[in-house]
Amino acid sequence: MPKIFCLADVCMVPIGTDSASISDFVALIEKKIRESPLKSTLHSAGTTIEGPWDDVMGLIGEIHEYGHEKGYVRVHTDIRVGTRTDKHQTAQDKIDVVLKKISQ
C-alpha cells in the first residue's frame, strides 16, 4: 500500500468509569501519542494525528490497546480521517487557508 498522507481526528473515551471527567484518561493517552514521531495536536474534543496512513492507524490501535493495558475495561474511539492526492496539506495548512479567507 502506498504511503498516503492522512489527517486523523481521534476522540477516545473510557466507558463505565466512576467519574464524568475523562481528563486523567486523556492525559494518559496524550502522553503515549507524544512519544510517537508523528505530529499531533491536542484540541478540546480529541487529537489530530498527521502522517502516513499505516503509521497513523498503527498508533491509533496502540493507544486504544494502551487504555486497556492501563485498566480501562471499555474504550470507545471515534476516528475521522481525511486524505488528498493532489497536494500535501497539514492540519495547520488547512487552518491557515480558512483564517486567510476570514480576513479578506
From Swiss-Prot:
User: Where is this chain's protein located in or outside the cell?
Assistant: Cytoplasm; Nucleus
Would I find Cytoplasm among this entry's keywords?
A: yes
Which superkingdom heads the taxonomic lineage of this protein's source? Eukaryota
Q: Would the keyword DNA-binding turn up in this protein's UniProt record?
A: no
TM ranges: none
Task: State a single Pfam family of this protein.
Answer: Thiamine_BP
Q: Name one GO cellular component term.
A: nucleus
Its predominant location is: cytoplasm
Q: Which keywords fit this entry according to its UniProt record? A: Cytoplasm, Nucleus
Misc remark: Present with 1900 molecules/cell in log phase SD medium.
Q: What family does the Swiss-Prot or TrEMBL record give for this protein?
A: Belongs to the UPF0045 family.
- PANTHER family from the UniProt entry: UPF0045 PROTEIN ECM15
- Tell me the subunit arrangement: Homotetramer.
Protein name according to UniProt: UPF0045 protein ECM15
Give me the gene this protein comes from. Answer: ECM15
